[in-house]
Every structure is written in structure tokens, then in C-alpha cells.
């Protein structure tokens, strides 16, 4: 059985915390489509921090992720997630792979003897993981674009 985190399948949304506001991850979809036939559809989704279970199930169905089971956990701490994964490992007998985007959870699950895969997309860094970049206010961006457009226009006019 493959246990894959919901964060692998969907990108976080800046608009809302609801699962329905998320967009599917192209890399997550490729990973899903690779493992699904190899493990005869024995794929489980691990949704941590999700409060709207029905909305999550509808999102998975709408996006074409046919999981054999979906496990929900309201608490989104590292310890709670690792404990639930250990419980699922005991219930299902053997988890072939656990796939997640959180390196702390992957390290602890791997330490407990479950094969893991840390999924990252190096060319896109999540804002919460980046320490060097800060979000700019929209007004600041608009001012900067306007200033660049004015400078470009002035450069083209020359002395008239």
C-alpha cells in the first residue's frame, strides 16, 4: 500500500484553507499515475489538518484521484501525524511507501522503519519554507511596475 499525503497531490491555496480552493500538483499527479498501476490501485490518501472531510472527498473525486481509502486527522502536528501513520502501518500490515512534502514527518516515519519518499519541487519554493523572500503588498508591486513603465517611456522619448 502507498500512503500519500494530500499536500503531495495539491498545492496550498493563498485564497482559502479549504481543500476545494487548492489546485492539483502536476508533479503529484505524475507520481500518483506512476504508482497507481504498479500497486494495483492500493493507494491511500493521508489528509492532515482537514476539517471538511466531504469537501476533500469531492475534490479527490473531481480531480480523478481514486484512493482505496482516505484517512483524516484534524490535528496537523508532526507528532500526531507520525503517530497516525504508525497506527495505519499496524492496521494495513505493511505500508510500502509513505510520500509527503514535510521533511520532519518523513524523517520520523523513516526512523520508525517505513520506507519514505520526500517530494519537493525545487524550482518552486513554498512561501512558508522560504526565509529570504517576503511577500510584497500589491500596492508596492503596482508602484514598481508603474515606475518601470515610466522609466522605459522616458528612455524612448529622449530630449525633445
Label the model's feature ranges.
Residues 1-80, 159-160:
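Alpha-helical substrate-recognition element adjacent to the catalytic core
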Residues 53-160:
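C-terminal cap/substrate-recognition subdomain and adjoining C-terminal extension
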Amino acid at each position: 500500500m502507498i500512503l500519500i499525503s494530500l499536500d503531495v497531490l495539491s498545492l496550498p491555496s493563498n485564497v482559502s484553507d479549504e481543500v476545494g480552493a487548492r489546485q492539483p500538483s502536476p508533479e503529484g499527479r505524475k507520481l500518483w499515475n506512476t504508482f497507481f498501476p504498479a500497486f494495483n490501485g492500493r493507494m491511500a490518501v493521508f489528509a492532515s489538518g482537514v476539517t471538511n472531510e466531504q469537501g476533500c472527498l469531492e475534490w479527490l473525486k473531481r480531480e480523478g484521484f481514486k484512493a482505496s481509502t482516505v484517512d483524516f486527522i484534524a490535528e496537523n502536528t508532526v507528532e500526531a501525524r507520525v503517530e497516525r501513520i504508525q497506527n495505519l502501518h499496524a492496521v494495513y500490515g505493511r505500508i510500502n511507501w509513505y510520500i509527503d512534502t514535510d521533511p520532519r514527518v518523513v524523517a520520523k516515519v523513516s526512523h520508525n522503519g517505513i520506507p519514505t519518499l520526500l517530494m519537493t519541487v525545487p524550482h518552486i519554493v513554498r512561501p512558508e519554507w522560504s526565509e529570504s523572500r517576503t511577500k510584497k503588498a500589491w500596492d508596492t508591486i503596482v508602484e514598481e511596475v508603474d515606475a518601470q513603465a515610466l522609466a522605459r517611456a522616458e528612455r524612448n522619448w529622449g530630449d525633445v
